[in-house]
Amino acid sequence: MRRKNSDLKDSTTASHAAAWRQQLHSRLKEGVLIALGALCLYLWMALLTYDSADPSWSHSSQVDQVQNAAGRLGAVSADILFMTLGYFAYLFPLLLGIKTWQVFRRRNLPWEWNTWLFSWRLVGLIFLILAGSALAYIHFHASGHMPASASAGGAIGQSLGRVAVDALNVQGSTLVFFALFLFGLTVFADLSWFKVMDVTGKITLDFFELIQNAFNRWMGARAERKQLVAQLREVDERVAEVVAPSVPDRREQSKAKERLLEREEALAKHMSEREKRPPPKIDPPPSPKAPEPSKRVLKEKQAPLFVDTAVEGTLPPLSLLDPAEVKQKSYSPESLEAMSRLLEIKLKEFGVEVSVDSVHPGPVITRFEIQPAAGVKVSRISNLAKDLARSLAVISVRVVEVIPGKTTVGIEIPNEDRQMVRFSEVLSSPEYDEHKSTVPLALGHDIGGRPIITDLAKMPHLLVAGTTGSGKSVGVNAMLLSILFKSTPSEARLIMIDPKMLELSIYEGIPHLLCPVVTDMKEAANALRWSVAEMERRYRLMAAMGVRNLAGFNRKVKDAEEAGTPLTDPLFRRESPDDEPPQLSTLPTIVVVVDEFADMMMIVGKKVEELIARIAQKARAAGIHLILATQRPSVDVITGLIKANIPTRIAFQVSSKIDSRTILDQGGAEQLLGHGDMLYLPPGTGLPIRVHGAFVSDDEVHRVVEAWKLRGAPDYIEDILAGVDEGGGGGGSFDGGDGSGEGSEDDPLYDEAVRFVTESRRASISAVQRKLKIGYNRAARMIEAMEMAGVVTPMNTNGSREVIAPAPVRD
């Protein structure tokens, strides 16, 4: 028991001793820091009050009274620092004080001696002293406040500066010593320049915010003063009414009555004008009921129920899409009128006199059309967009400066409860059903809830841009499904280029594809070259037929088939008198979709820009259209050449006005709400239309793709991805020939090529080229020799051949 008590007593004594030592160590540390701080102040005082007449280290003096505030020791210390460091002597106490303050801030942390860290701090201090003194010697001259024999950099700076200037000149020496100075400051003071920039930026922003808040408070106080003055005047008038009868002076009493009558007349006039002023015209809010279905929807509802297989050549039903949700009741006319009055009040607080003329509520935003007072510039209202958003407590406010056919200015304010626009709503509308184009694009609803259906053939190309998460990919899916619900593979074909390998790969296997979804950027360039070659081939074909566009060509072919006299290919080259030209068939519209052409331009280079520009310039009449999408709307991606040839653009939400101007040549996209909210710039106009994009889920896309796969397999043209000469035809002359003069029936590989073609039933030049590992020109001559020998048929209008000869019998 005694042993336990003694052990407990010893442990208690040890703990008390440890605590006492820790407390003593903390107090000693504080004392040392106080002493160092006092030393810094003492040196600073000695330097500031230095007098060259005082006795010092560099010279003697007979003066009895020392002028230096730090005394004789201070005069000697200042003289030594000036003679050694020059002007840098002023910074030496400051650096010592900074390090003292840094240690003082960590006084409560456990202190451990670190030789490595102390050595680096000492190296940093040495670099600071050497570089600072040298810079002072190079760029400054000694003043009368310093010793007569001292230079601006002291003895250290003078020695280093002379050597450095002789070797590196003034500019080079400055660069080297400045870098050493910054390095020394970083190591000695543990300073991060990135943190310095962050702190500086934050201080600057806080300063400007402080000024802005002070200005807003001043404006608010000014408005309150004006309101208070008006109230005081009204009180004075009321008091005058009561006091006036008791005034003995008849003359003053009559003047008071006259002033009162004038005020009453002015008040009555103002009230009558306010009552006569009509309330703002409020459009009826979008009906919560479902819109009237189109004829196609009604027809699909009456379709037979026991049809298990999809019929080839038919369109998938719209029932594959998710049904539209029931709309909730939106704002009442009273709330919209109150909102319009609030908007007038807020603008008046900012010094802009307006009146709300009409209100147009929509599913996502509400547009207030305001009539500015005489002399009010629209730019003043546009500059108040962010202030209005703050004062109205909304995400963003977009100002429409010009409304065609009206003198009003539009202010678009987001609704509190945003309604989702389902894709089935847009496709079920009569506008989509009655659209005659084979490549319609269902974008969504406008601000009033009406469906927006555009024609890609009239655009004829489209540029889509927006930041990540703005709804760009969903918008591209909606455009593709618009085409798939309207056109069969004989009417529209697709070439999809997907550098990200995620967005468009879901469409792999649908019969509309001319080639597999392209994910290799080299093959993407080949696909664009094939498109250029197909464009040239179609132009030659239409020129020979005497038509001006693809619609005229297809109409002429159909009329000839109905008349029983089908047309033949005018570009067919007869190899023998027995050869018959193939019959012409209608040509489909080709849509080239590039999901992220910024990545394609980065990998392939400027050649892609030239191919895109060439297609955009000439491919409209040939029925080839581009849809280019990117999430990086910068000038090196959306170049002037591309913008000049693609006037139709869609901008989703972007991060800055610069990006909006890059896409639309005007601002506005930075004020969108995201999630499919877009600005659509139609061809031939400079005024964008705000559209709320329709939402398409991944499940809906999968259902539509599976429905098309049941209706047929894709008929790929393999030559598309092999590389085609732009001057060739649709089956084109591809690059990569080996220059061999062989290729006829005398070619040693001809028999092997025939065996491969007849066994695989693929009469493709690129397939022979890959199988035999030969150049394109040699493989092309082999295929031509097979055509002359009757092994394969001549080239069809779509660039493919059929194998006639049977496969050889193997032993």
Swiss-Prot record:
<feature type="binding site">
    <location>
        <begin position="469"/>
        <end position="474"/>
    </location>
    <ligand>
        <name>ATP</name>
    </ligand>
</feature>
<dbReference type="InterPro" id="IPR025199">
    <property type="entry name" value="FtsK_4TM"/>
</dbReference>
<dbReference type="Pfam" id="PF01580">
    <property type="entry name" value="FtsK_SpoIIIE"/>
</dbReference>
<keyword id="KW-0067">ATP-binding</keyword>
<keyword id="KW-0547">Nucleotide-binding</keyword>
<keyword id="KW-0131">Cell cycle</keyword>
<comment type="subunit">
    <text>Homohexamer. Forms a ring that surrounds DNA.</text>
</comment>
<feature type="region of interest" description="Disordered">
    <location>
        <begin position="269"/>
        <end position="296"/>
    </location>
</feature>
<dbReference type="GO" id="GO:0015616">
    <property type="term" value="F:DNA translocase activity"/>
</dbReference>
<feature type="transmembrane region" description="Helical">
    <location>
        <begin position="73"/>
        <end position="95"/>
    </location>
</feature>
<dbReference type="GO" id="GO:0007059">
    <property type="term" value="P:chromosome segregation"/>
</dbReference>
<feature type="topological domain" description="Cytoplasmic">
    <location>
        <begin position="195"/>
        <end position="811"/>
    </location>
</feature>
<dbReference type="InterPro" id="IPR036388">
    <property type="entry name" value="WH-like_DNA-bd_sf"/>
</dbReference>
<dbReference type="GO" id="GO:0071236">
    <property type="term" value="P:cellular response to antibiotic"/>
</dbReference>
<dbReference type="InterPro" id="IPR018541">
    <property type="entry name" value="Ftsk_gamma"/>
</dbReference>
<keyword id="KW-1003">Cell membrane</keyword>
<dbReference type="InterPro" id="IPR041027">
    <property type="entry name" value="FtsK_alpha"/>
</dbReference>
<keyword id="KW-1133">Transmembrane helix</keyword>
<feature type="region of interest" description="Disordered">
    <location>
        <begin position="728"/>
        <end position="748"/>
    </location>
</feature>
<dbReference type="InterPro" id="IPR027417">
    <property type="entry name" value="P-loop_NTPase"/>
</dbReference>
<dbReference type="Pfam" id="PF17854">
    <property type="entry name" value="FtsK_alpha"/>
</dbReference>
<feature type="compositionally biased region" description="Gly residues">
    <location>
        <begin position="728"/>
        <end position="742"/>
    </location>
</feature>
<comment type="similarity">
    <text>Belongs to the FtsK/SpoIIIE/SftA family.</text>
</comment>
<feature type="transmembrane region" description="Helical">
    <location>
        <begin position="172"/>
        <end position="194"/>
    </location>
</feature>
<feature type="domain" description="FtsK">
    <location>
        <begin position="449"/>
        <end position="661"/>
    </location>
</feature>
<dbReference type="Pfam" id="PF09397">
    <property type="entry name" value="FtsK_gamma"/>
</dbReference>
<feature type="transmembrane region" description="Helical">
    <location>
        <begin position="31"/>
        <end position="53"/>
    </location>
</feature>
<feature type="binding site">
    <location>
        <begin position="693"/>
        <end position="694"/>
    </location>
    <ligand>
        <name>ATP</name>
    </ligand>
</feature>
<dbReference type="GO" id="GO:0005886">
    <property type="term" value="C:plasma membrane"/>
</dbReference>
<dbReference type="InterPro" id="IPR036390">
    <property type="entry name" value="WH_DNA-bd_sf"/>
</dbReference>
<dbReference type="GO" id="GO:0051301">
    <property type="term" value="P:cell division"/>
</dbReference>
<keyword id="KW-0132">Cell division</keyword>
<keyword id="KW-0238">DNA-binding</keyword>
<feature type="compositionally biased region" description="Pro residues">
    <location>
        <begin position="281"/>
        <end position="291"/>
    </location>
</feature>
<dbReference type="GO" id="GO:0005524">
    <property type="term" value="F:ATP binding"/>
</dbReference>
<protein>
    <recommendedName>
        <fullName>DNA translocase FtsK</fullName>
    </recommendedName>
</protein>
<dbReference type="Pfam" id="PF13491">
    <property type="entry name" value="FtsK_4TM"/>
</dbReference>
<keyword id="KW-0997">Cell inner membrane</keyword>
<feature type="transmembrane region" description="Helical">
    <location>
        <begin position="116"/>
        <end position="138"/>
    </location>
</feature>
<keyword id="KW-0159">Chromosome partition</keyword>
<dbReference type="InterPro" id="IPR050206">
    <property type="entry name" value="FtsK/SpoIIIE/SftA"/>
</dbReference>
<dbReference type="GO" id="GO:0003677">
    <property type="term" value="F:DNA binding"/>
</dbReference>
